[in-house]
Amino acid sequence: MYLDYLVLGAGASKFNNGDIIATLAIFLVLMFLLKKVAWGPLMGIMQQREELVASEIEAAEKARKESHQFLEEQKSLLKEARTEAQSIVEGAKKQGELQKDEILTAARNEANRLKESALREIESEKEKAIAAVRDEVVSLSVLAASKVLSKEISEADNRALIEETIAKAGEAR
């Protein structure tokens, strides 16, 4: 057991006050030196690290806000582009309808013009046919009348007489 006391450096009932004071003094000097040499720089490094982390958090927050603002701007621009595209499509539809109406109106007018032209041409051809038939009837009537009467009257007198008769017949209708 004696050996245990030697190893530990103390006796069982004996306190060495000088050793206690020396140990305490060395501890305090060592703490002072650690504070000056190690604790100050260590705390400075920790402070710098804390500031770096805070600035990175602040930068990340700023970037998040900027990206959110950019996203909102992009949404706004997209909405504006969609609205503009919709108005262009609607304008094109209206323009298409107007052009369709103009084309239909022009086609109807052309059809009416062609119809009226055809009716005038038909009327003209009808008048020509009636005049030709009249001339033929007059010629045949003169020929028939001259054969019936066996005498020949002047063709001009006979034609005038027949035209007068046909005109009276036309008025009677």
UniProtKB/Swiss-Prot annotation:
UniProt subcellular location: Cell membrane
Protein keywords: ATP synthesis, Cell membrane, CF(0), Hydrogen ion transport, Ion transport, Membrane, Transmembrane, Transmembrane helix, Transport
InterPro entries: ATP_synth_B-like_membr_sf, ATP_synth_b/b'su_bac/chlpt, ATP_synth_F0_bsu_bac, ATP_synthase_B_chain
SUPFAM superfamilies recorded: F1F0 ATP synthase subunit B, membrane domain
Membrane topology: Single-pass membrane protein
Keyword Membrane: yes
CDD domains linked: ATP-synt_Fo_b
GO cellular component: plasma membrane; proton-transporting ATP synthase complex
Residues spanning the membrane: 20-40
Pfam families: ATP-synt_B
Molecular function GO labels: proton-transporting ATP synthase activity, rotational mechanism; proton-transporting ATPase activity, rotational mechanism
Oligomeric and partner information: F-type ATPases have 2 components, F(1) - the catalytic core - and F(0) - the membrane proton channel. F(1) has five subunits: alpha(3), beta(3), gamma(1), delta(1), epsilon(1). F(0) has three main subunits: a(1), b(2) and c(10-14). The alpha and beta chains form an alternating ring which encloses part of the gamma chain. F(1) is attached to F(0) by a central stalk formed by the gamma and epsilon chains, while a peripheral stalk is formed by the delta and b chains.
UniProt family annotation: Belongs to the ATPase B chain family.
PANTHER family hit by this protein: ATP SYNTHASE SUBUNIT B (PTHR33445:SF1), ATP SYNTHASE SUBUNIT B', CHLOROPLASTIC (PTHR33445)
General function of this protein: F(1)F(0) ATP synthase produces ATP from ADP in the presence of a proton or sodium gradient. F-type ATPases consist of two structural domains, F(1) containing the extramembraneous catalytic core and F(0) containing the membrane proton channel, linked together by a central stalk and a peripheral stalk. During catalysis, ATP synthesis in the catalytic domain of F(1) is coupled via a rotary mechanism of the central stalk subunits to proton translocation.
NCBIfam families for this protein: ATP_synt_b
Protein name: ATP synthase subunit b
Organism whose genome encodes this protein: Lysinibacillus sphaericus (strain C3-41)
Gene designation per UniProt: atpF
